[in-house]
Amino acid sequence: MYAYNTSKTFVLALLLLLPCSLLTITSAAQDEPEYKMELGGGVGLTNYLGDFNGNLTRDIQPMAGIVAKYKVNPRTAWSAVLNYGTLKGNSRNEKTYYPDYAGAPISFSTKLTDFSIRFEYNFWPFGTGNEYYGAKAITPFIALGAGLAFAKGDETATAFQMPIGFGVKYKLQKRLNLALEWMMHFSGSDRLDGVSDPYGIKSSDLFKNTDCYQGLQLTLTFEFMEKCKTCHNDRE
């Protein structure tokens, strides 16, 4: 009888402690700090796409950059990105015939400085310690933005550019994030290669017959500026 009562008391104690334990675990997850900002840098590859190159894998050059992000909520963020790299091209590699350059093929190398403001959308809520609203340590994302491109070679060109692309983010640690992204930058200029309108056909459209460039970049960012723990609206 004594053993039965002891067992009954033990079971009742477990039943009472279990909800308390679950509440403690949930509270700990909810109290996990979240951060508003990210700051970091990245390295990658870029190449020019225009009149003298239509190949995504030709004349690939290195690039590097810095990035700052403001996280609106686990699904969305705004980022400011500054990149520096090189664009190269050569008309000898193109099948298109350019009468003005048939006897003197064009070869160029320009230093590219690129700045843009982007909006990022994560397909899954991104983070750790917040599983109660579905946060994931890895997520694919898409990005769209606007900015400026500065190309300096034999000539200097400044152009409006619109980056659009996608990537994947992975949380290495609670405050350390790794991202791999591919972006296509559509510029409003045909002079990033130093030559304007080699076809001799003028265009009035913003992105028609203009130069573009792409970038594949790996970035590492650190989170800082802790969010107010009583602000829950941005988690929806």
Locations of the language-model features?
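Cleavable N-terminal export/targeting peptides
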Residues: 1-34, 223-236
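Residues on the lipid-exposed face of transmembrane beta-strands in outer-membrane beta-barrel proteins
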Residues: 41-45, 66-70, 117-121, 144-148, ...
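Residues that define the transmembrane beta-barrel architecture of outer-membrane proteins
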Residues: 35, 58-62, 111-115, 136-138, ...
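Outer-membrane beta-barrel strand-turn architecture
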Residues: 33, 70-74, 123-125, 170-174, ...
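Short glycine/proline- and aromatic-enriched beta-strand/turn motifs that initiate or cap beta-hairpins
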Residues: 28-69, 217, 221-227
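Flexible, surface-exposed loop regions and adjacent strand-edge segments
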Residues: 57-60, 95-101, 195-202
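Predominantly the C-terminal beta-signal and adjacent terminal strand-loop region
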Residues: 112, 173-236
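Gram-negative (and chloroplast) outer-membrane scaffold detector with strong preference
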Residues: 74-156, 219-222
